[in-house]
């Protein structure tokens, strides 16, 4: 028992198994774990993880990882932001409640909540570390962060409600402007972790990536993309698709969802952005692989255009 607790203290994946023995495996969880370990090692990470919905990302990013991080570093400060404050506060409550369980205290026996600061959106450890939960637009003046977590800071309503075309740049100006204001809250050598599904080339991730490309001297963002379906090619050159989390979502189920979404107005950009993390393919007028044809003869028929 003591050995397993010691392992969970140092290894996030073993901590998850300790807290949730029925947790499903998944390749994308290995990617998240690797990123979390880099942050725990003190690397000042600027990391974007774009991942399809319903993949357990928030459970790990906004709940289990902060709980583990606070246990490892009870003097540090964590700031967690979602599109609305209530979501981040709910995660704060879950972490707070987890910290008072025997399972958690077996792993981190010396870490406790401070008696005078236990609200779900603002609490402290007995080592004066802090957790603060907020939403886009929340006031963060006077607060600092060693770890800033941005989890799905764009709401589905603002991105898709009634829209047949991809959202415009203006739809995301408020979130972008607010993000600029919280950068001053980050401590030296602090890390920023942005985990979200893509919505548009103008969303926060799109702008961060674009800013990095235009200004090489600025912080360069590492981007990890985890789509719902992964394109595979067999030895004969035939294309097929496989679910990236077959333990939970079968390939058949994801293909059916894709076809259902594609059949609806605006479904193409929704699928390509939200599920495939490819907002560059968010227009239904873009060429698709199905449009291409092969000719066995050495010269093709007469063409209107040659690319």
Language-model-derived ranges and their functions:
Residues 1-45, 302:
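N-terminal accessory segments
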Residues 44-64:
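Walker A/P-loop
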Residues 46-48, 77-79, 130, 147, ...:
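Residue-level preference for the first positions of well-ordered beta-strands
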Residues 61-73:
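Walker A/P-loop NTP-binding motif
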Residues 77, 81-140:
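Conserved nucleotide-state-sensing and coupling region of NTP-binding domains
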Residues 121-178:
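Conserved RecA-like ASCE ATPase "motif II neighborhood" in helicase/translocase motors
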Residues 160-234:
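ASCE P-loop NTPase helicase motor core
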Residues 233-307:
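ATPase catalytic-site recognition across NTP-hydrolyzing enzymes
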